[in-house]
A protein has these predicted regions:
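Generic short beta-strand segments
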Residues: 52-61, 95-99, 145-158, 185-197
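Acidic, glycine-anchored loop motifs typical of Ca2+
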Residues: 61-73, 80, 201-202
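Generic detection of short hydrophobic beta-strand segments and adjacent strand-loop junctions
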Residues: 74-80, 123-125, 129, 211
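Bacterial Sec-dependent N-terminal signal peptides
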Residues: 3-11, 15-46, 218-229
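Tryptophan-anchored aromatic micro-motifs
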Residues: 41-68
Length: 229
């Protein structure tokens, strides 16, 4: 059986978000305490700047073998920066290759024109994500709250606004950022669907990604990894 491998999530991340569990009354139960301004500044100093210059995305057109298992992903250049003051901090992604999303749109007559237009789209796309620093030790962890990724595509004799939606850290444990034990910054976003010419942008009504990867059907979104080489 072919195995689709999402990028690994460190155990520390799972432990970090344990604060969502309910109070059992146990004296040993610990509650999450927000970081102090000094701790946030420490997190910021370890993540700020244009460190993440690569992205990795799921693709069965690029197959590698690791420990006897096939992995399906490709890497591309990207410009990603984190700036702010440790309190109001934003991760900005510039020159995002939005055409990679064409792989996750179904092969059918209704989506054919959209899919083809997206494959050919070469213009740079930028988007932002609010950064919330969550943990400073043993590793820096931060939550991400990304904007929709918006692009205007020409097809079918008209211009169409297409928005791609990402889960925030509040909706998915697979959207987050961290500083690794090698002091490298990484960020992970889960893009789960798209909407063409939205009627009400304040109330998104996206179509979920629904695609096959190496013969395996997937419908719960795709993970994009931004990382420091």
């Amino acid at each position: 059986m072919k195995k689709i491998k999402l990028f690994s999530i460190v155990a520390a991340f799972v432990a970090a978000f344990a604060f969502t569990s309910c109070n059992t009354g146990d004296d040993n139960n610990r509650y999450y305490q927000p970081l102090t301004p000094a701790e946030k500044q420490t997190c910021y100093s370890k993540t700020a700047g244009s460190r993440m210059r690569k992205l990795a995305y799921m693709s069965d057109e690029h197959v590698t073998a690791k420990d006897g298992k096939k992995e399906y992903y490709d890497t591309l250049d990207v410009v990603t920066s984190i700036h702010g003051d440790g309190k109001d901090t934003v991760m900005t992604v510039n020159n995002f290759p939005v055409k990679i999303f064409a792989r996750y749109i179904p092969e059918n007559a209704e989506m054919k024109d959209l899919k083809e237009a997206l494959k050919k789209y070469e213009m740079p796309v930028n988007f932002k994500s609010v950064v919330y620093y969550y943990k400073v030790t043993p590793v820096v962890l931060f939550m991400l709250f990304p904007d929709a990724i918006t692009v205007n595509l020409e097809y079918g004799g008209a211009t169409h606004k297409v928005k791609f939606y990402c889960y925030s850290s509040g909706n998915s444990p697979y959207t987050f950022g961290q500083v690794t034990d090698k002091s490298k910054v990484e960020a992970y976003l889960v893009v789960y669907g798209y909407e063409v010419d939205p009627k009400d942008e304040k109330k998104p009504n996206p179509t979920a990604f629904n695609f096959n990867m190496a013969g395996t059907p997937l419908s719960n979104g795709t993970q994009i990894k931004f990382f420091e080489p």
